[in-house]
Amino acid sequence: MKRFFELLIQYKYLILALFIAISGFGYKAYINIPVDAFPDITPKQVVIYTESAGNSAEDIEKLITYPIEAAMSGLPGVKMILSNSIFGLSYVSIFFEDDYDTYLLRQLVTERLNTIDIPKGWGTPVMGPNTTGLGQVVWYALKDKENRYTPSQLRSIHEYTVVPLFKAVDGVEEVISWGGYEKQYEVLIDPLRLQNVDVSYNEILEALEKSNQSVGGQYLEFNREQYLIRGHGLYQSLDDIRNTVIRTKDAKAVTIQDVATVQEGKAPRFGAVSVDGKERVFGMVLQRSATNAAKVVKELKEKMPLVNAALPKGITLEIIYDRTQITHKAVSTMTNALLMGSVLVAIVLFLFLFELRSAFIVILSLPISLLIAFLLMQKYGISANLMSLSGLAIAIGMIVDGTIVVVENAFRLLHDNPDASRAGVIAEATAEVAKPVLFALLIIATVFIPLLSLEGLAGKLYTPMALDIVFVMLGSLAVALLLVPVLSFMLLKRSKHVNSPLMSGIKYIYTPVLKLSLKYAKTLVGITFLLFFALAYLLSQQGREFMPELNEESIMYRVIAIPGTALTQSVENAQAIEKFILKTYPKQVDSVLSMIGRSEKGETAQANYMEVLLTLNPEFKEIDSLGKKMTQQLKKKFAHLQFVPTQPIAMRIEELLEGVSAELAVKIYGEDQKVMSTIASDIAKVLKGIQGLDHAEVETQLGQAQINIKPNYLALSRYGLKVEDVMKVIRYGVGEEPITQKIEGVKRFGIVAKLKDATQDINTLKSLILRSDSGRVVTLKEVCDISVIQGPAFIKREDLSRYMVLSLEVEERDIASFVEEANTKIEKNVNIPDGYYIKWAGDFKNMQEATQTLAMIIPITLLIITLLLYTAFNSFKKAFLILLGVPLGLMGGIVALLIADIYLSVSAIVGFIAIFAIAILNGIVLVSFIDDLRQKFPTVKTIDLVKDATLLRLRPVLMTAFTTLFGILPLLFATGVGSEIQYPLSVVVTGGIISSTLLTLLVLPGLYVLFFKKT
């Protein structure tokens, strides 16, 4: 091995050139790496939505949703199918295993869609945009400064001017329009005039459809020239519609204008958008899957001037929400922690080494290792985000460990061998420590294998972190064993090393303490392990949660009214809320946006639902206290509405993973919605007295008022009417389904044949006049049974089974103990009939999955580490000795967790895994050096050798500890966006480093003496 390092030194300029090139590519990767707030946590999914205008949730479930679910359930890789059937829409989301290609899945879904038999006229299933659940990168609104345009005009301007320009931006998958009104042309039929001219409604439909068409007649040749023949019969004006002939009677044409008024109108809408008390037209940009959100937003903003120039005078675009704002805040939090950690590590290194050249070599290894990590991140498609950058921040102190060992050994041997060849001495020094350095860094990488095994949300969050730690440790290994020998040869001198004042002081205090610890080794070891078991018991009693809530520095509410609330009423509610907030908090809140109901593209919200987002004054920082105070005031002021505080990204994550808009929920499965509702209400009552439950909300799937029109077949036959005649009147005359379109350039607007006053009230609807082809006239109520009933507002399904959600808000209590107590009470007090069952969803399920996976993988990882340690030391005894150092490190982590009074979460478990790595590293450094001394001085007593070796290794052990500690401290004290997610991790690691270092220096030497006293 020595020869290998001599060759490296011989070809030193080649090695330098190689690392300069690698650093250059690494820097290029760094500046081009995609930036995002989070890793892409979206499961592989394909959404299918089917617009079925005017149809009820029950009918849509039976005729559309179920056939789609049944067809898709047999596709390869399907994990779960969620669906929601609501008035006018079927929404089916198919979740796949993550190792499938998105475009292959969309192709498979397309093939299956072609086999589904949906009844004619019930809509066409369409695949949703190829985006992620967090794909909403920009929200904006059209601002009409002079109030010159109608809501319909603004909607048309948006759809035909703004949308095409934004969709042309690379990475934009879809632009959704919301708010305003879609323009349509109305043929407003007067039933009395219709009666006078003896024309049926069916004839009007047929006339409109057949009169608006364009055909081609091939071509003719004339005078050696070819002329194309076109039959251009498309409607050009409203007069064309008015003059459309319905039928000819007594040589006189009956036209549309004889029975109807033709005018511009508004299509039925299912949602609206209000900003600061005024309705607005709103746009939502969705990024394509696997694209760079920051780049997409940047290009959208660059296109803004062009879009504003294309808009009519007086209209501008106003950005309301930009996801890169939280992205930059989150990344800035981690970047600042990384930079500050690097600076602190550099200071620590100089204070301990007290020699500029050595310190320079070690400090230089930091950026080079990080650049190698960025190069590998780019290679494997990992973005710079909150989780991946925190992995680098955790590893910042460990990066230099290998370099420290190599440089320190090289410096010592150069001083001890003044006459020997510099190249030979440095090669020998590197060869001496190469094996422990190699195995130490490999073991550190191995320690993080459990994180790579996590699945679901935990896997998507923590896998990038683990990979980044592995990448940067591989980079540091390459630097320590390839570059550092070359730099040591070029920079280190043979001058006598002067101990730093810091090290001299520490050694002065530590030496007598070490002697005492060796003298009373058995007692110290016994007390230590008793203390460990006591702390382990306390940890088992600590509350558990999946992960701390991300503070997005925003305030948002889900607002829910009673089912069946009209859209106009919801708009009034929204505007009242907006005005109240702006009046009450003029200094803190700049603007309030309300998204009511749904857009016309695959959203599933009802008219009784809205999302309210506040734009806060950038100068205002006390967001938490403001949110709590505001929530109380809103609940008091608008007692008839339900306010659920949330945040934009958090809400999308919750909905995305389980179809549940809550951190914790109970899903009730079964067939009958009334039975499920009863079970949910019973559970809510039982849970009411449990400590920590702030609010329980039963999903109100029932309660939608419906007017049922059921044909009376006997009465229809008496009047010569067909069921089809009645259904066409309901579908087109009442429901306003477009019959044809008026094309205006690239614009398309529906033409509807609407019965005048048909939807004025129920009595008017009952009195609608029907005319048979034979001329018989009758009202709707004479041939149909018309009743008002309560039906489902929506029907949710999971894997072909209906379910209902009971959402729970738990405050000031951990999720795990709450669920444990709740389960006990439910089993004792709630009667769940046969065919019905419940499941917990949300954070508890994620936490369960993560802990079960870790419980299985960590023992396997321990076995791998044991084998690596055995390979390094050729002794199971020494491997076991080093592994005994792990509990010593865990003790400090447990104490820190208990003192900070935070729950045991996946983030905290990651901290314990990091301590595992640090403890093993300390053990390897110390044990390998003791072994070296025992080989050189076989006749010296073990206890004396251990004492000398520990004192000699004091500096590298302390440097390892302090660099890791100071590397993690900025993460511990960070206060920006995302810091709360890594806080448990940094608390645990900080405590673990302190205990691991103290106990490695006090207990491990004694353990070594006890293990090898007789050898």
PLM regions and their residue ranges:
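C-terminal transmembrane helical bundles of large multi-pass transporters
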Residues: 323, 360, 389, 633-1014
